[in-house]
């Protein structure tokens, strides 16, 4: 009986992994990289025109790009080759703090919307190696799901300054949560916080997805979820976002 159970479990894992692989590679995983390196960066350097990006900062090492999904979603991406959360470059002190830069770029959402969008409605997210469709690092700048916003508001006083499991998880998946100040977020990359503070995370960064959300007390919550095929968790932190931005119509 036990052997049968183990066999079925193995089959489930294999099928789940195959499904993830198909989903990931069914398109062009280098599409974003080609846009950045072959269009946005050359156009900015040669013609001082960031198109098709919204902004190109060669010296700072990043671009901001309007994503085609959702009316207000933007992506922050490096101007050089970094695949994703698994890249050792993200743990180098000289690497830009991409999450902080993404937070500074949230104003593009308001500009597109035509009105100021409150910080509480904004979220940042990056997916894991198997939870993404593109192999160029990109942080999603978009609206937070209203139900996730409500849950994090309710958990405000229970979120520690250490990485601890978020009570109840999010979207049916387990998450770690850590509270940081604005100054901490500006000075230290969430990638480094995860790698240095969560046991064994440094050696398996590609398994993790990360998100950043502003709280009502002006602190930030860092959220991390680890890939777990047994629970069908591809570690896609983008799941906490709502690219249709329903939260704006409820305010």
Swiss-Prot record:
Record-linked Pfam families: CDH
Membrane topology: Single-pass membrane protein
Cysteines paired by S-S bonds: none
Keyword DNA repair applies: no
Gene Ontology terms, MF aspect: CDP-diacylglycerol diphosphatase activity
GO cellular component: plasma membrane
InterPro entries the UniProt entry points to: CDP-diacylglyc_Pase, CDP-diacylglyc_Pase_proteobac, HIT-like_sf
EC number, UniProt record: 3.6.1.26
Keywords in alphabetical order: Cell inner membrane, Cell membrane, Hydrolase, Lipid biosynthesis, Lipid metabolism, Membrane, Phospholipid biosynthesis, Phospholipid metabolism, Transmembrane, Transmembrane helix
Pathway stated in the Swiss-Prot or TrEMBL entry: Phospholipid metabolism; CDP-diacylglycerol degradation; phosphatidate from CDP-diacylglycerol: step 1/1
Membrane spanning residue stretches: 5-25
Chief location bin: membrane
Keyword S-adenosyl-L-methionine found: no
SUPFAM superfamilies reported for this sequence: HIT-like
Enzyme class per UniProt: hydrolase
Origin superkingdom: Bacteria
Subcellular localization, as worded in the UniProt entry: Cell inner membrane
Biological process per Gene Ontology, one example term: CDP-diacylglycerol catabolic process
Catalysed conversion reaction: a CDP-1,2-diacyl-sn-glycerol + H2O = a 1,2-diacyl-sn-glycero-3-phosphate + CMP + 2 H(+)
Family note: Belongs to the Cdh family.
HAMAP family from the UniProt entry: Cdh
Protein's name according to its UniProt entry: CDP-diacylglycerol pyrophosphatase
Chain's gene name: cdh
